A protein has these predicted regions:
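A phosphate-binding catalytic loop at a beta-strand-loop-alpha-helix junction
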Residues: 110-123
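RNA-binding accessory domains that recognize and position tRNA/RNA substrates
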Residues: 1-16, 41-42
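Cysteine-based protein phosphatase catalytic domain of the PTP/DSP
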Residues: 18-112
Length: 123
């Protein structure tokens, strides 16, 4: 009997909402090269990317260039610092609540929002 072990890959799971979408994905650089994953992310044409991970986690995935590269493509980037397997603290929750109007406006205006953490499963 042969057992096939699948390698995790960078994949964006999208949910279409009216004319916009919400996507969920891992950190670019987590499963393959940052540049390959970044290209796949921007091919989805998001207007907004929200990273829910810590700076050390971003460093471990070689993703510290993510904000700058998104900015250069005029894609808004927001960072909510949430530890893996934890709930957001009060500050992070306030930041999330302040982002909600931007995210809703983007989605219901026909744009795309991609949320990422390290593994792409959610915090």
């Amino acid at each position: 009997m042969e057992i096939e072990i699948s390698k995790s890959v960078f994949e964006i799971v999208k949910i279409e909402i009216e004319s916009g979408f919400v996507g969920l994905c891992p950190m670019p650089g987590k499963f393959s090269s940052f540049d390959e994953d970044f290209l796949q992310l921007v091919k989805e044409l998001p207007q907004v990317v929200v990273t829910c991970a810590t700076q050390p986690e971003m460093m471990a995935c070689s993703a510290t260039r993510l904000p700058e590269k998104l900015y250069n493509l005029e894609i808004q980037w927001f960072h909510i610092d949430v530890e893996d397997f934890q709930v957001p603290d009060e500050f992070s929750e306030e930041k999330w609540n302040s982002l909600l109007p931007i995210l809703k406006e983007t989605i219901f205006g026909g744009g795309g929002v991609i949320l990422n953490c390290v593994g792409g499963c959610g915090r």
